[in-house]
């Protein structure tokens, strides 16, 4: 035998081992299954080979990503810490042949004998396993495999989850399962039993398998299984007492050195007889075996011991590796995708169990979890039980488990729980395979929908049965894959599963018994099939469930079980533990169709009834303040208010004005006022004084309650109650319900609409109206106990009735925000999350501000109404929640029709936003002609009229208006009713649904949910300023715009007057002065034409200078991990001057943003608040977004900062403490940003900075070239800033792929396919329309062209070049180095012919590649550039060769600016590359390990990659004159070929050739270049000899320069010490070899390093490449960050960086520097 070292091949994050030594021998000796490397390839090795791996060193360390991933697999490892216990004490085991201490038994060779531990174990409850032990010390690490192996393969998905758990808790036994087989009824010898066990080991590979982690990595996903050959020493214990049995069965597995099944034979001597009886135990770890495996083993064990044949037939079936491959294919299939969608649906809207009981104070249980047997169900009984429901009894039992576990948990309104259900998940053909295939998956028990529908238990069984049935179809989808998907869509805290259910089929016969895994769940229900029935056992977490709680749970199970047999159709709401949890149900309230009883009910009494029934339910809460109020407290305090009001001698119908801050007190007073028989009128505290006074007059209020002792309006004759001074008196009032007779037609409240006239319209709502509305909502608004409703509406707005009355009458909780005025955007999302809001009502305008990226897991229902709803908005939210599209005038009590759009993620049906549903119960919607009351036929358009008990009394004090809108009618059944004409136009379709089509005649609108009459607003404008001769108010977007005549009007003065007397929403945001307004034929203002005029003027009014949205340097500095001190840019100004400059700069910036939103023609007072200047909450969110984008300040300022600091001055004060002073003064204020498409088409932007005079003489600048624009796409980076982060963080940006089943090429002998490649994410954002292309046309164009077009356009935009596209007098050249176009002939090209297609092709198609337009020409055409165009290919030096030509073209005056690019994208995209096997062709360029290590002793080649980049360069003098931002200055350039004299071959670099090019570049850069050189960015391909030859070339060049004295003059009159080290680096270890684009990648890296003053190190440098002989040179590979000192202006010193050559036969070198006095204008973020 001999050992062979193995090489590792990484396949989708999993490891497979391959022997490095490959014999040229027949395939039976070394067989590779699946040579094309399927995703989970099993590699079978030579049976004669050994296996050796280096010994592990150090402890097991989890990477940060591994820890995060492990923490997310909550279903397996997330709860281990909750049930920790002491590790079981173990004694050492011996492997040598020895005599047993007890009984004198001679053990066969290879068996292991355990020493005795005295312990009484009777009976054997330990077979369910102890709880998990604490996390192990850091010293634990699995060992590598030893011995003779036959195969290695990756772990299955399920095994990976269990392996993660094992690595965290290696001494835990919570995934043990044990098979017990009694062999006492037949005479057997021990030798026979041992022979049978060994036979099973030969037959089943899993019994010879160990588990391991790659020793060279800390990535736990790179784990694998090793299958040993038949000589593997199975662990068999032969024992004689229970103490030894305990030790053997409970001993933790060492899965890296023993198989996952441990055999224990307990021998018992019969008294007075020489015969012994035996009991065989198979103690298994769940990673290797499941229940079905134990069933297979029990059958085969009994069959084998009864057989006379020694060698039993192999029934094991396919190899487990085949199962893993099948699983991988399944996950990539459409069936796998469908399964993933189903399982995600089972998690959607679920919450973890939150147990109601307190954990037990003392835990007096053993250090294991016990299986507590609850019931035994005889076979006949359980079959009859299932027949009652025409389904499997297991589905009935699962439904009961769902009910009783929900009873033990806190109610989760609108959410369900998921039960972990175990599935066999064995594909056909694997029935006899001993392995782990069981799959425990979450199945939703839909209790919330069942309660909502008032379902029966039979309905519950059907619903759960459907879920289980569908789950069974998708049982092969792994739990790990589900968790990976769920973590992308859900909050990981929701993936905490606490209840599991399993069904274990019967074993071979009664002599067999299976002890299930204990698991990590709080409750594990085990249904164990036996010969004559099914036993139910429960394993519980003793730290969660004490004896009392378990007893209660068992009683509930038995109760529901008995009820389910006696009465299958009992209502779930009849169960005691589910009473008062049904949503949309009153406590002792009227039926939905009992009109008379509803009219006599009172909403405040319904709330009182809830308080009496469920007093401890939370009625009101605020998560921000951490306060809440129960129903008991709410009822008591509202009754105290009622008694207090009666003491004030209020009469029925008297109006009480409530002038309070939004909060609990508002609700208390509203309910108290109604209980006292009065009606309430809510006054919004933000309203102007005149508005409040007008309402006070109209309402004739008798009493006003306020918490504002300094009221800003006249109270007239109204009695005022100040809240604070009256608090003690109110608290002394009785808490009993106030006895007051309130009639059906008594007023409940008055809400004032429009408010734009001098006499506001007060809608009078009676108690019966309110009762009918709240009752009717039960039909669709399914809120109930524990539902949480957000309080969002103003209390003066009728939507507040939906929020408080519906929520509290149904037992829900109303949630308050600290700042309700700004409940939009991120703040709204924050409040929803912090309060766990389930339901809220808002306008479409507010709903549209919610960030699309916020998950909002608690949110289930959204009601939207108050204004027209965009179809796209409805469609988006319909896919996330249940959407209620509501319609209802205030005059009809909040809402009169509802369209319920149930959640449907997959729907493709467009929503008709005009459909607003059917009438609520007891209401009737009629369509009438104007001025008539007779209803029109269906589908005829007319005025929408509402008839029924929700129609209010009319307008307070406006009898004439009431008579025109409200009509008393008699219904067909003779009952009187009331009709309201809405003024809305619509029709009723054949399904009875109402469609709305705008307004009829008048100019009443809704803006941000507020109803407004534009005519009344116009009258007020005319009244406030007699100089106004004409005015037209129009709605543009969410704002009001006033067109006023004449043009000399002072609009600010008018607006200030309006704000004093009108609500803010009724005051136009913008006033636009015009010379005249359009008139119609009657000489009146034509408001239709005026509307178009207003929209056009607003559009032109908002054209502003472009805002520079570049992030500040502070953000970029933090991103790259460099200290600000290192990057601080020095200035001459003192601190005070800088502060004042910054304030002026910020003031101009913020003012520009205000102007963008509110009108650029306006002058803004810095002290005026945003709302007073015309803003509103929706515009405030836009302002907040613009400020954050403009200043890049992370989480600050928040929306609340902008709200509370509402003036320009205060916002500037806020920003002064946030922004980076030096960086901000490097840019000038502008006003907006152009779109991506515009930047591509025009490539024009305004410059963000100008440069100061340079210390470089003008004549010296003739051959200096400035880099003024940068754009790139490289692996792991779509911007230069992202590239910098990759480099600084030393990240490996190469992608590891799962190889395709069929590669596009054949593997040659001794070749290997490496599934690693540097991919770029560059095509998804390509917009064909931006370049006048169709999508179809773009798909046929070489991706290299598409990507380069993007980067070229972005680079031009970044440069802010003054060049004019298409102007021949201002030419811009294009010089691009590009790889060969392989897309034309690839299978990825839609235009290419499939293999075997013999159809004749046209000449153009046949010669397509020959005729293909060069990339440079294509780009110049699409970007309309008129300078010289060159496209070339010199392999890796292509981009720098193009740069050399561009510099020459600029020098000759051929163009004024040049776009220089490099692009390389290979097709087809195979997801890897082919190279020589390890130890094969030493000249191979590509790395067989898949990792590039430049200048490192581990270097074995490079890794290919795609890439694209573009620079814009100008002559330095032109760049300075144009005020361009300069990234770097090119000082020296040299290009040459090596020739052939001293080259080993075409692809081998020449040291002498390299040295000549380096020397030439440095000499052209001037005498200062060499003296200040600190760093060389090499090509660094990562080939051992290539890197060495490159270093040798540098050494030769520097030796010659030193001898000629080039280094003696530093430019400052002093010599530079030659002992200074020069550091070398390369980017190939980060991004791979990007071929034609690689030169620009290095140049971008060097430019950024100069600007930021730090050079990124080589990634993970180990030992330097010894072939480079660094000790003989002044060069050193850069292993850590290198700080570069900024240039000193006085001394005029500069840093230089040299760019190195490519790996073929020509070389291009550049020397670049910064211009010192331009440095303050450079920002790190500028390269983004």
Curated annotation (Swiss-Prot):
Disulfide bonds: none
The organism of origin for this protein: Pyricularia oryzae (strain 70-15 / ATCC MYA-4617 / FGSC 8958)
Result after altering residue 1635 to A: Increases by 2-fold TeA-producing activity
Protein name stated in the entry: Hybrid PKS-NRPS synthetase TAS1
Pfam families (alphabetical): AMP-binding, Condensation, ketoacyl-synt, Ketoacyl-synt_C, PP-binding
GO molecular function: 3-oxoacyl-[acyl-carrier-protein] synthase activity; ligase activity; phosphopantetheine binding
Modified residues (O-(pantetheine 4'-phosphoryl)serine): 1177
Region called Condensation (C) domain, residue ranges: 153-499
Catalytic site positions: 1436 (for beta-ketoacyl synthase activity), 1579 (for beta-ketoacyl synthase activity), 1633 (for beta-ketoacyl synthase activity)
GO cellular component: cytoplasm
Chain segments carrying region Disordered: 1225-1256
GO biological process, one term: amino acid activation for nonribosomal peptide biosynthetic process
Keywords annotated in UniProt: Ligase, Multifunctional enzyme, Phosphopantetheine, Phosphoprotein, Transferase, Virulence
